[in-house]
Amino acid sequence: MKKLMTLLTGGLLLAAVQLSAQTAAAKPVIMTTDGEEIRAALVELTQSGDFRYAESLKDGSPKLSIRKNRVRWAWIPKPEEITKADNLLKNKKYDEAATAFAATAKSFGPLGWEPYSKLRQAEALDASGKQSEAIKVLETLKDYANVSPRNEADLSAAYELLVKFYANIKAWDKGLELSKKLMYAGDAAAVSALFARGDILSARASETNSQDDRRDAFNDYAQISLLFPKSSRAAEATFRAYQTLTVLNDARAQIFADKLKKDYPKSDYAKQL
């Protein structure tokens, strides 16, 4: 798979992606407001924000155009610039990574990569001790409208991270409000929403010693454990449910301990029992 990004002197910001014909699922996609799905070989974004695309590599440079107000969302495979920013973050070059992700959020945001870029930018900022800046970055996603199946998980992860930051600064109401917003998305978002709500309720309970908050947090973790057993986070949720009930001196804690050992015996959480 080859990926091409060029800045055209004629005033076009080209985010073009060349893909093998065998990898149809990884082709750039433009979803129009009337529900038409356009699978392209090349996609470019003009400086005015409109889209140009080519349906086949044989067509040469993109000639077909579509106005931005007719695009519900667009997506291209991960650009090389984002992979480079990932490596900066992985190598703990946090300031450089934050700057790089800020740039990719701007350049590739309309092409589906704004949630991912801002999530990673916030992680880099937080790692360098700039949590307040990280919060501001994530808050720009609160009204994000270009949600697609390609970036929904990244958006949910960004919201969940923002809820955790709100918990850190004791902005309980903001965190709970945002977790409610997550509830109305798909299953993956629902798991994130339940975790986010459970975590902020647990954090508030630690501060206020509210048993009601602890019980509500348990309900959130238990829902993930029982309703989404195949989720990659089910073991963690089961452990959190066990922990919360233990703090509440509730005998049902053993039920979740047994479930954790039975259903997720190789998980790190089962090893902590």
Regions found by a protein language model. Give the residues of each.
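Bacterial N-terminal signal peptides that target proteins for export
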Residues: 1-9
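Intrinsic disorder/low-complexity segments enriched in polar/small residues
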Residues: 3-4, 19, 23
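Bacterial N-terminal signal peptides
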Residues: 8-16
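Compositionally biased alpha-helical segments
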Residues: 21-148, 153, 157-169, 173, ...
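Terminal, low-structured helical/coil segments at or just beyond the last alpha-helical repeat
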Residues: 212-215, 235, 239, 245-273
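Amphipathic alpha-helical interaction surfaces
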Residues: 227-230, 266
